[in-house]
A protein has these predicted regions:
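Active-site core segments that coordinate phosphate-bearing ligands/cofactors
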Residues: 2-189, 194-243
Length: 243
C-alpha cells in the first residue's frame, strides 16, 4: 500500500463504510427511541430499540450503535436513482434549449413543485426499482411509470409520485417495526442527498414513516461528517469517556 515507505505502524485507519454507524453518529441518534435515515441512491433507516424484537423478520437487520445498543435496520436497494434519472431528463431538455443548468436549483425547483401536488398524486403510479429489491421480492430492477387517461398528469403530481415511491420499500420495512413490533420512535434524523433540498424530503419522509423527521445542517454530508466525528473521538477521547 505504501511504496514510499513513509507510513508508520499503528496509524488509525477508517475502513470504507456506508452511512450505518457513521450516520448514527452524524445525526447523534444513538439513544433509545431515536433513529436516523440515510436516503440517496439507496436508503436505510436505523431505529435504536428499547427491547428485542418478538420474532425474526427477513426485512429487518439487527445491528448495534457504536456504543453497543440494539438497532433495527431497514435497508433498501432503491431510493433516488430513478428520480435522479428523471431530473437529468429535465437537465437535458434545458441544455437543448441553450440554457445553463444549476443542478442545485433544478433539484430545488422540481422537489418544491412536488409539494403543490395532490395528496393522492393525481392517481399517478411509479415503481423506482433500478435494481432488485429484497424487501418486496424483486430479483431485478424495472423502473416503471404508469397513469390512466383521466389521471391528473402534471409536473407537481409527477414529482410527488416519484418522491413518494423512492420511499415505498422503506415504508414496508418500517411498518413491520412500528405496527407489528410496536416499536416506539420519538424522532427520525434525516441525512443524505434526498434531504439537500430544504424541507421537501423531510416532509415526504415524515409522511412515509409516520413520525417527526428532523434534518441537520450537515444532512448532505451524512456519513462523511459522522466519520470525522468518530475519528475525532478516537484520537482525542479522554480515559473512560464514552461515545
Amino acid at each position: 500500500l505504501d511504496v514510499s515507505g513513509n507510513l508508520e505502524a499503528g496509524i488509525p485507519m477508517c475502513p470504507p463504510e456506508g452511512d450505518a454507524g457513521t450516520g448514527m453518529t452524524a445525526t447523534n441518534s444513538v439513544k433509545v427511541r431515536t433513529g436516523n435515515v440515510s436516503a440517496g441512491t439507496s436508503v436505510f433507516a436505523m431505529v435504536v430499540l428499547e427491547k428485542e424484537l418478538k420474532k425474526v423478520h427477513p426485512e429487518i437487520d439487527l445491528v448495534t450503535t457504536p456504543a453497543g445498543d440494539l438497532v433495527g435496520m431497514v435497508h433498501c436497494n432503491n431510493c433516488t436513482s430513478d428520480l435522479n434519472a428523471w431530473v437529468n431528463l429535465f437537465k437535458e431538455f434545458m441544455e437543448s434549449m441553450g440554457m445553463e443548468v444549476d443542478m442545485n436549483r433544478l433539484f430545488g425547483v422540481l422537489y418544491n413543485k412536488a409539494l403543490e401536488g395532490d395528496k393522492d398524486c393525481g392517481g399517478l403510479l411509479a415503481y423506482n426499482y433500478f435494481s432488485g429489491e429484497h424487501i418486496t421480492g424483486f430479483e431485478e430492477g424495472r423502473p416503471l411509470f404508469v397513469r390512466r387517461p383521466d389521471d391528473k398528469f402534471n409536473l407537481a403530481n409527477f414529482m410527488r409520485t416519484h418522491l413518494y415511491t423512492s420511499l415505498g420499500a422503506l415504508k414496508t420495512g418500517l411498518d413491520i417495526l412500528f405496527r407489528e413490533e410496536q416499536v416506539k420512535l420519538d424522532v427520525l434524523l434525516g441525512h443524505g442527498g434526498l434531504f439537500k433540498t430544504k424541507g421537501v424530503g423531510q416532509k415526504i419522509m415524515a409522511a412515509a414513516a409516520g413520525v417527526p423527521v428532523e434534518v441537520m445542517e450537515t444532512a448532505g454530508e451524512g456519513g462523511a461528517w459522522g466519520a470525522a466525528l468518530l475519528a475525532s473521538y478516537r484520537v482525542w477521547k479522554e480515559d473512560g469517556e464514552t461515545l
